[in-house]
């Protein structure tokens, strides 16, 4: 499925030094998708940065035939956001 990144999200992604390729990976091959606020979904993938486990969370909405990225951020609080099956 195609995706679009809204301008504010792209600005935040760049400010946070998150590679666009990581955002694409999270959307196309998420390790987990969880429910977010207001019907949004959050695609999640774990990355290792400087030996530290980090969780990339990409918040998106599905509109017609594409995913629209609202924001994305990295967090070290993997256990807080990761949902156990």
Summary of predicted features, one role per range:
Residues 1-85:
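Ribonuclease/tRNase effector modules and their secretory precursors
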